[in-house]
Amino acid sequence: MADVLSVLRQYNIQKKEIVVKGDEVIFGEFSWPKNVKTNYVVWGTGKEGQPREYYTLDSILFLLNNVHLSHPVYVRRAATENIPVVRRPDRKDLLGYLNGEASTSASIDRSAPLEIGLQRSTQVKRAADEVLAEAKKPRIEDEECVRLDKERLAARLEGHKEGIVQTEQIRSLSEAMSVEKIAAIKAKIMAKKRSTIKTDLDDDITALKQRSFVDAEVDVTRDIVSRERVWRTRTTILQSTGKNFSKNIFAILQSVKAREEGRAPEQRPAPNAAPVDPTLRTKQPIPAAYNRYDQERFKGKEETEGFKIDTMGTYHGMTLKSVTEGASARKTQTPAAQPVPRPVSQARPPPNQKKGSRTPIIIIPAATTSLITMLNAKDLLQDLKFVPSDEKKKQGCQRENETLIQRRKDQMQPGGTAISVTVPYRVVDQPLKLMPQDWDRVVAVFVQGPAWQFKGWPWLLPDGSPVDIFAKIKAFHLKYDEVRLDPNVQKWDVTVLELSYHKRHLDRPVFLRFWETLDRYMVKHKSHLRF
């Protein structure tokens, strides 16, 4: 259900009638009390910890009815009628919204609780006196109409009396009609039956025609069905055709496994092998069925009890595989291993070997006293405007562990044309959670001043100095132009970015200089990253 302010705006724009009855304001089939609060915030409230106040429906409706008056006259008249006044800063904005000149207003609080209007019945009921007057009216009957009704009823009764069968008048059919006339009537009845009733013979003829039609179509449809292929997609392949879902899944897994493994190496024909006469090929022995008396084929050498041990051999310089395979395997020379082509799916890197990320990383201080924090990092680096962290907290922004900003820049094409592209940058304030391989992607760090900011970092000197860190990562320091520079920052290789307290139009050049400095550094030292 819409709020009362939106309903009032709709009625005001469409010039609909707003009915004020007692302490209620009626909008068609809905009504609200006069003192109901809207979601329009009173100017000057809701700041510095003060609770928000909202204009009532009565005060806004009184403003619409007296919009032609000047503000002082309107204030005096509202005070006379004891109605809250719409303040002067809100007057123009509120009237613009109610008249349809603006689609919304900054003073409208969408999170304010809505007052539900009462629904009124739209059925129009007659008054009790009208009902009584209607009941007291005498019913005038036309004598002519009554006479006609009586005549019509008498004629109907007379016709019914004539239609009564009298037994004295019943005669035999042979007495009333001749034999030829009776035969003619029977012939007509039979002809009518043949034309309206379908016999069993007709059913047999129709079924025979349909069967011949189906037989003629079988040959045509058989050829079509033989060339049909079932269309399989990611969705249909997961839909089981039977009650047992495992049959479909196992069949898919077997086909995927067979495709991944490819053909076995021994089944692949050697590409450079010379053609061999089929008559010279030795047939592979076919394993016979199990026979409990066929123990002789498991019998080996008597002296070694079938363990294929060469008593005249030596184990010097041999591997375990050559020992287990026996002497015959040691004597045969193993051919040089040919490179076996791998399937296309195996040529890809395994899933655990992911391709390294090329997204640059920017580290900012985790302290709340820093000018750049996780609350306003996107405003500073992406939108190029400075918004204090305290203001972001008042807006209800939540702090995140890391954020991804999209930097917009112009990139030159080979033809000399420039196109606008966006480049992602990862911003973090907890560098100790970075993986060892992530430090190669760290391109910039915002320095706050104290050296303990770099505790636990790589490349930190034993005395705690971050000089080597600044040799590998570009460092920046953000401060107000009226604040004195930190002594540690003066000693370090840090680019200082100064912001004005009040001149917000100077923020964009400062952050553009940050990106230009970072681009020059990345071209020289981090050219493998995406920027």
Curated annotation (Swiss-Prot):
GO molecular function per UniProt: RNA polymerase II complex binding
Cross-link named Glycyl lysine isopeptide (Lys-Gly) (interchain with G-Cter in SUMO2), sites: 198, 301, 308, 321
Ranges for the region named Interaction with POLR2A and PAF1 are 200-531
Q: Which GO terms describe its cellular component?
A: Cdc73/Paf1 complex; chromosome, telomeric region; cytosol; nucleoplasm; nucleus
Alphabetical keyword list: Acetylation, Cell cycle, Disease variant, Isopeptide bond, Nucleus, Phosphoprotein, Transcription, Transcription regulation, Tumor suppressor, Ubl conjugation, Wnt signaling pathway
Q: Where in the cell is it found?
A: Nucleus
- UniProt cross-references to InterPro entries, sorted A to Z: Cdc73/Parafibromin, CDC73_C, CDC73_C_sf, Cdc73_N
For the modification Phosphoserine, the affected residues are 212
Name the source's superkingdom: Eukaryota
Gene3D superfamilies in UniProt:
RNA polymerase II accessory factor, Cdc73 C-terminal domain (3.40.50.11990)
Q: Which GO terms describe its biological process?
A: cellular response to lipopolysaccharide; endodermal cell fate commitment; mRNA 3'-end processing; negative regulation of apoptotic process; negative regulation of cell population proliferation; negative regulation of epithelial cell proliferation; negative regulation of fibroblast proliferation; negative regulation of G1/S transition of mitotic cell cycle
Q: What is its main location?
A: nucleus
Chain positions covered by the region annotation Disordered: 260-292, 325-358
Which residues lie within the region annotated Interaction with CTNNB1? 200-250
User: What residues bear N-acetylalanine in this entry?
Assistant: 2
Q: Which cysteines are joined by disulfide bonds?
A: none
Record: disease: Hyperparathyroidism 1: An autosomal dominant disorder characterized by hypercalcemia, elevated parathyroid hormone (PTH) levels, and uniglandular or multiglandular parathyroid hyperplasia, adenomas, and carcinomas. Hyperparathyroidism 2 with jaw tumors: An autosomal dominant neoplasia syndrome characterized by primary hyperparathyroidism, ossifying fibroma of the maxilla and/or mandible, renal tumor, and uterine tumors. It is associated with increased risk of parathyroid cancer.
Free-text function comment from the UniProt entry = Tumor suppressor probably involved in transcriptional and post-transcriptional control pathways. May be involved in cell cycle progression through the regulation of cyclin D1/PRAD1 expression. Component of the PAF1 complex (PAF1C) which has multiple functions during transcription by RNA polymerase II and is implicated in regulation of development and maintenance of embryonic stem cell pluripotency.
What does the annotation say about its assembly with partners?
Component of the PAF1 complex, which consists of CDC73, PAF1, LEO1, CTR9, RTF1 and SKIC8. The PAF1 complex interacts with PHF5A. Within the PAF1 complex interacts directly with PHF5A. Interacts with POLR2A, CPSF1, CPSF4, CSTF2, KMT2A/MLL1 and CTNNB1. Interacts with a Set1-like complex that has histone methyltransferase activity and methylates histone H3. Found in a complex with BCL9L or BCL9, CDC73, CTNNB1 and PYGO1 indicative for the participation in a nuclear Wnt signaling complex. Interacts with PTPN11. Interacts with SETD5.
The UniProt similarity line reads: Belongs to the CDC73 family.
Protein name per its UniProtKB record: Parafibromin
Report the gene name.
CDC73
